[in-house]
Regions:
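Acidic, polar-rich low-complexity tracts and alpha-helical solenoid repeat scaffolds
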Residues: 1-174
Length: 174
């Protein structure tokens, strides 16, 4: 089913397998495969239209993250847990980047408080992600836009103390 891109049916079959056989030797693989299929599902739906997966609906990314997390939680010593951990890092970066794009959208539309809150969310919930620096930079810009100079300077201080060679890799369309 997976190879024929029948993702939903494959996930349902894996859910049934996991429920029926919660602790046999192949169960960790079922957890892993469920995460892989969900990750693939999130990537394939809009690949030809939007190349950056963070700009799409990220529900499947959230689901894949949950499935890999469950695998690691239930079977920490499984041979699939190490690979699942690597996938969690990638998925977290996608989720953080998605939040950044939402903050950027708010900035573009003049919703500066909403953009600041999204930037804070990135920093608090995805502290080791690749989007933290952009989030801090965007936060400073939005604080400037509402004349909160001290808060803008605080954000810049943290940004350049943490990322001394930072250069923005995004553009605000106004």
């Amino acid at each position: 089913m997976f190879k024929r891109k029948k993702y939903n049916r494959a996930i349902l079959a894996l859910n049934e397998f996991i429920e029926r056989y919660p602790a046999i030797p192949s169960t960790p693989y079922a957890y892993y495969l469920r995460g892989v299929i969900t990750e693939e599902k999130s990537a394939s739906i809009l690949d030809e239209i939007i190349s950056d997966s963070a700009q799409r609906d990220v529900q499947s990314v959230h689901d894949a993250y949950s499935y890999f997390y469950l695998l690691i939680d239930k079977f920490p010593n499984s041979k699939y847990s190490e690979e699942a951990s690597k996938k969690l890092v990638v998925l977290k970066n996608i989720l953080a980047r998605h939040e950044f794009y939402v903050a950027l959208y708010y900035t573009t539309n003049g919703s500066h408080i909403a953009a600041i809150n999204r930037s804070k969310y990135i920093i608090e919930n995805y502290p080791n992600s690749l989007s933290v620096a952009d989030g801090l930079h965007l936060m400073a810009q939005n604080y400037d836009a509402i004349n909160a100079e001290e808060l803008a300077q605080d954000a810049r201080t943290v940004l350049y103390a943490s990322y001394p060679n930072y250069s923005p890799n995004y553009k605000i369309d106004r």
